[in-house]
């Protein structure tokens, strides 16, 4: 039987926490193979341009005129704290958090960029917090937050089933964020993506007249 090998790219949150079930389901067929590259949005788009990927699932921004795309889902973005923190389960104002240590991903991270953009739109910046810690590992961030060292803002998928971590919300910060499936024009990538991810995603991809 002919084998089908997909070349998939994903940003870190999506590759590490969102696609696992889809990968398991897809590999349930003996004729299916895949390679998954987890990298930042910029590099994944470059790989699409060079035909090194069939499609990418990303949280970052991209040219909606250059690529075709569709919305995979809107992902909750949440504040996280230790389970026994007085912040846990509350709806807070940003002023309530400035005395905390803020733990963020490294420069260039999509998660960090989204948080910084929303902070700026609300009139704040990272240096308004008492202390800023930058860590590239989700595992380390979660361990420090669970240990009461500080707070962070991550996608819900990253902290699902984490019994030692609580969540909170903040107006203007913890709004859902889109995850998109992105692919080059004039390819069969949409069919491959829907075979891999399911075909019930919202159809918001860009259809040009010349396609």
Give short role names for the model-derived ranges:
Residues 40-45, 49-52, 58-59, 120-168:
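Hydrophobic hinge/microswitch elements
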Residues 18, 169-210:
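A late-sequence structural motif
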Residues 68-78, 156, 163-178:
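Short beta-strand->loop
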Residues 5-9, 56, 80, 103, ...:
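Short, well-ordered beta-strand segments
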Residues 66-103, 107, 191-193:
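Flexible hinge/capping segments at coil-to-helix
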Residues 2-64:
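Central regulatory/effector-binding core of bacterial HTH transcription factors
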Residues 22-29, 112-128:
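Ligand-binding cleft/hinge of the Venus flytrap
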Residues 102-123, 190, 207:
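Secondary-structure junction motif
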């Amino acid at each position: 039987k002919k084998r089908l090998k997909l070349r998939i790219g994903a940003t870190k949150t999506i590759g590490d926490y969102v696609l696992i079930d889809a990968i398991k389901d897809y590999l349930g067929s003996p004729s299916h193979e895949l390679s998954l590259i987890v990298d930042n949005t910029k590099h994944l788009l470059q790989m699409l341009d060079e035909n090194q990927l069939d499609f990418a699932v990303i949280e970052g921004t991209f040219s909606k005129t250059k690529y075709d795309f569709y919305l995979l889902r809107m992902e909750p973005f949440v504040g996280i704290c230790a389970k026994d923190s007085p912040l846990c389960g509350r709806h807070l104002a940003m002023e309530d958090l400035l005395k905390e240590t803020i733990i963020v991903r490294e420069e260039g991270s999509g998660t960090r960029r989204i948080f910084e953009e929303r902070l700026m739109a609300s009139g704040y910046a990272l240096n308004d917090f008492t202390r800023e810690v930058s860590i590239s590992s989700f595992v380390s961030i979660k361990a420090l937050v669970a240990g009461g060292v500080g707070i962070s803002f991550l996608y819900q998928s990253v902290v699902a089933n984490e019994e030692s971590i609580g969540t909170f919300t903040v107006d203007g910060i913890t709004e859902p964020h889109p995850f998109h499936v992105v692919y080059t024009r004039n390819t069969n990538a949409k069919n491959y993506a829907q075979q891999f991810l399911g075909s019930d995603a919202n159809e918001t991809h860009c259809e040009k007249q010349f396609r």
